[in-house]
Amino acid sequence: MFHAFPPLYVYSGVSASRLLIGLLAVSAVAADARLDSLLKAVEGRYNRAKTLQVVFHEDYTPQGKPRRSESGTLQLRKPGRMRWDYDQPKGKLFVSDGKYLWLYTPAENRAEKMKFQESEDMRAPLAFLLGKLNFEKEFRNLEGKAEGADTRIAAEPRTENLPYSAVEFLVTADGRIKQVKVTGFDRSVLDFAFDQEKVDPALDGKLFQFQVPKGVELVEAGQ
């Protein structure tokens, strides 16, 4: 009995397809391994640090409105303390003492006070740097993409009880965070660029305390 066999090019096509699938699978595993290694480098860098200081540039773009740019110096101290000193606008201050957040705006002659956990300010995502940084615990759907010599890591928060829906980190090969982009549920975007990072500088605890200046209006959240 005569048996018809598929042409040789059919076998070649099947073999090539299987080879391609295999190569893609190996490539995906290698990419995942590289991303995992980079995430561990970032975690190690910031989990070991007790204090941190960086110069920041901040762009805030509300949905359908013009972008607003601000800049200054950010100082962090574990546990739970941070201080944003703004050069632009001059005198603006955002402080956390680990329990409360304070926002002082000289141009409005007003200071706002709120509990740290109740804050919906989108600077709050950076607070994870004040504790034990764990990407797998804090975020889901982590993806990495090369951007020059750096890697852009995209992620979503695991909990929905936060004012943002997505975060991106631009990270150097040695685990330094150069940029953080936060997208809110209202589609507003807050983009931070960091430079001149100093790990474990001496920071006085008084930097993270705030006294309302005389004559300034105090607004307390929930009051």
List the model feature ranges, each with a label.
Residues 27-68, 81, 212-223:
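N-terminal leader/targeting segments and the immediate start of mature chains
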